[in-house]
Amino acid sequence: MRPTGRLHLGHFFGALANWLKLQQEYDCYFFVADWHALTTHYEDTSSIAENTLQVAMDWLAVGLDPQKSTLFVQSQILEHAELHVLLSMITPLSWLERVPTYKEQIENLKGRDLGTYGFLGYPLLQSADIVMYGEPKQDLLVPVGEDQAPHVELTREIVRAFNFAFGFSVKIPNDIDTRNLIREQLPETDVAPPKTPPLVQQAFDDHLRRDFREAARKAMTEWGYENFREKMGANAKFFTLTSVLQEPAYIPTETPRLPGLDGRRMAKSYGNAIWLTDPPDEIRTKTRNMLTDPQRVRRTDPGRPEICPVFAYHKLFSPPETVVRIDRDCRSAAIGCVDCKKEMAENLVKWIEPIQARRKQFEANPQQVWDILDTGSKQAHKVARKTMKRVRNAIFQWDEARQSSNPARAGKVATGE
């Protein structure tokens, strides 16, 4: 989540409510994405630190538990930037340009200088953020809304390309039957005939290896490794793919409809938000001016709760029996919009009271919040270091090089950590 400052009800129901459930079931990593904030607002960084504190306070106030989840700040884990750079080496520009939100944000943020790699490449940084905390052969799950699903799909493609580039190896078989099978499945490749002289055999093998790598790269990027192995059948025995990075899967996040005060999506830029920190009287004032059913002009006109933003709030903050009554009385014009808003506002105030009470405790001791973020950053750093050691070795083969240059030390590992 970007450090935009205090959070509003849209943040809670759009993300935080789901996070509270996930932390009960999974090892969760939640971070303040301060680097991502630079992709669209690099010209003014003066508020990032304070906004980071405000976001973290709201996280803790709604119930994110540092004993159950790892809470940290993105820029404190430098490995995110390193992995971002390494992923950029194998990611075509066209993959980034086709991300749906790329053109949408350009349209929505007119007037800003968005002609930077930071803006174009932010989905790639997002991919690094995701896969940093994955372990090969273990589920890596990302909770996202429908609009963010393409980002996870992009990450899956990038991981496939990366694993192929640095984890794929081919060993050309010597037996004639397997070579003939390769010829049948890949007729465009050159498979050396029997009794070929060694040097010619090597040339054929090199050519076959190149052809097969390219065909395999395209297939694995499209299908995924396991599906590729299944389709290759018997030929799967002469190649291996080491999963350096784990492909993520996304958990669809179902978010209840919570419009802003004017009926549009709740957003800071629209000025239509109710903040988690709004005092009770401010909540009452804001909700008093909420948009309602535009066809209900007079008090005696029947209403349509299904299109009324106020009723959407009732469904989230009022008791079930109240929701049933409001639905009935609105349709029959037994209750007017003014009274309906008042009742909803009081229920909203009751719902938000414990959140604000917890937040006041953290406001009185902001150092506690920084300490929680620092502790979380240290925990995240341990995982990131492990991931990057695996990544660096896959790309540069540092461990093998050191051991081969000093046979006496092979199999012995010393560390100053």
Briefly describe each language-model feature range:
Residues 82-85, 94, 100-107, 111-193, ...:
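Classical nucleotidyltransferase
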